[in-house]
Every structure is written in C-alpha cells, then in structure tokens.
Amino acid sequence: MEHDRHGARQPERFNPERAASLNDRTRFDYLPPKDLISLLGLEPKGVLIDFGAGTGLYAIEIAALCPEISVLGVDEQEKMLEFFSENLAQSPLKNVQAVWTKDEQYSRLKKNADGVLALNVLHELGDRAMEEIQALLKPSGRVLFVDWNSEIERPVGPPQDHVYSPQEGRLRVIDFGFSVLKERKFPYHYALLCGLKN
C-alpha cells in the first residue's frame, strides 16, 4: 500500500537516490541501536516491525543484537527494499527480513507486532501511515517514534522546517490516538515510546 501525504510535515518522501547515506554506520554514534532496544523493552520471541526501514541498517543491527526476536523491516518504496535485500544478502542473520507494503505478507502483519520502530519517519508520515502503525500493533504493543529534533542545529538530517519539535511530535502522536509512556532526547533526535489508548 502506498500512503498519501495528508498530515505529513515533510512535503515529499525520502529520495532513494540518497540511500547510501542511510547505510552510514556512523549514525550509530549519535543514535545507538542498543538504546532503542532498551526503550522498546521487547520480550524474547517478540516481533519488531521497523516501519519505513529504508536500507535496513537499523533493522539488521537490531536483529544481530537481539537474535531472540523477529525483525521485519517494511517500506513502501520498492527501491529502498532492493537496497535492504542487498544488505541482507551479506548477512548470515535468519531473524530479519524485508517486506514491501504492497506485498501480501504485509497484510498478514496486522495486530502481530509487539513493537514498532518508526525511525526518522514521523515527519514523513501522513494520516494513513499513522493508522497503519496502529493496525500493526498488538493491543499491548508499543511503538517507538524517533525523529529529528527541529530545535537542534545539526550537521545531518532534513531541514529543520521539515521536522517537528519534541512538543509538536508529542501532540501529533497523541492526536492520533497514542498515549506517550516515555520520552528521551538524543543529540539530534527525540524519542517517544507510545502505546495504544484504551
């Protein structure tokens, strides 16, 4: 499924021609995967969906650090998943896979996720994509929104006027029916751990 852009802060999707920047492991220096895993607090045998996984850099690293969980990296851009699949081909991991949102397998993921990671995509997510995240979660599931902080000058990431401040991001997820359980700041990012409102 291709998501419309209604409600998104950034005017257009990430350009796959810039995908090489997503494979840069120095991203882990300012946004460590271990910290994201800790915030999500997944149980062994849990299912994590990396929503908007891009080239799979974080999905693959999290799968390597947590061999007891299943990691599914989903993306709506087929070109991104080609890069993801190339990266997977160089990995011996069996607990991670790439899933296209237009594939039948994606439709079977509804209400299957113990956790959803929405990394660097909140500013790109239209209303329909937010609904998709809700649909993927089990009733007790958690979603971790981690996005660029518009209040911080930084040498990387999208323009500041294309992303939210932590308060704006918080209001966005609350307005969409999530409850914020925990918040954290990183050098260039903010994180919101959320659950579904009862």
Mark where each language-model region is:
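Helix-to-beta-strand junctions that scaffold the AdoMet/dcAdoMet cofactor pocket
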Residues: 66, 125, 137-139
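Class I SAM-dependent methyltransferase Rossmann-like catalytic core
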Residues: 4-31
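Conserved alpha-helix/loop element of class I SAM-dependent methyltransferases that forms part
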Residues: 27-45
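C-terminal alpha-helical "lid/dimerization" subdomain adjacent to the S-adenosyl-L-methionine
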Residues: 20, 26-27, 142-193
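A short glycine-rich, Lys/Arg-flanked "PGG" loop and its adjoining helix->strand segment in the class I
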Residues: 129-142
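Class I SAM-dependent methyltransferase SAM/SAH-binding core
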Residues: 49, 55-105
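A short SAM/SAH-binding and catalytic strip from SAM-dependent methyltransferases
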Residues: 114-127
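A short acidic, Gly/Pro-enriched loop at the edge of an enzyme's catalytic core
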Residues: 106-116
